[in-house]
Each structure stands twice: as C-alpha cells, then as structure tokens.
Amino acid sequence: MPLGMAWEEIVDSELGIIIIRAEDCLHCVELRAILSEQPLSAPMEWIDKQNATDLYSQYPLFAASVDILPFAGIFSDGELKQVVRAATRERIEDALSA
C-alpha cells in the first residue's frame, strides 16, 4: 500500500479498508501490531474515532454502525460494502473474501 493514502483514496479504491480505533482500545493496539506483521491484501487506513467527523458525514450508515472497536469498514469504488465489528485479522479477511 502506498504510504500516506488519505481515507478518501482508500474509500474510492477498488477495494479498501478503514479501521476506526480509539486511544484507549487495547484490541486496536493488538490488531495494529498483528497487521504490521501480516498486512492485509487491500489498502487500509486507521482513523481515530475522535477524528472521523468528515468520514462519518459522508457515510452516515457507516457512522451509525460503529460500535465495538476496532471497527472496520470495507469500501469499494466509494461505496460501503461490509462492516466488521470487533475486527480481527481473520474477520477482516473473511469479509474481504465474501
């Protein structure tokens, strides 16, 4: 994945993943460590839930779905295709292959 891709580029790509995180989320830290060792097959961007206002305003259904962190949204060509609650590498991979 190219470094520094903005969330807009991820969402507009053929297949991209946005992961919502929080500073106090231990599962988010664990997932980030796992994904740094074993990257996913699609471009990905991490967004702190406090900084997701623009994303949420463009994708209100995604915003309304966010509950258990880390929370992943799988996008394709500007459309939300799938969400993954309490995301793990395995759950995200399953959603990508669905």
Task: Locate the predicted segments by residue.
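Short, glycine/charged-enriched secondary-structure capping and boundary segments
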Residues: 32-35, 60-61, 87-89
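Eukaryotic short linear interaction motifs
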Residues: 26-27, 53, 92
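Residue-level detection of beta-strand scaffold positions
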Residues: 17-20, 43-46, 74-75, 80
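Thiol-based oxidoreductase modules, predominantly thioredoxin-like and allied folds used
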Residues: 3, 20-21, 40-57
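Local sequence-structure signature of Cys/Sec-based thiol-disulfide redox active-site neighborhoods
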Residues: 2-40
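Non-catalytic, surface beta->alpha helical segment in thiol-disulfide oxidoreductase systems
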Residues: 68-98
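Short Fe-S-cluster ligation motifs
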Residues: 53-69
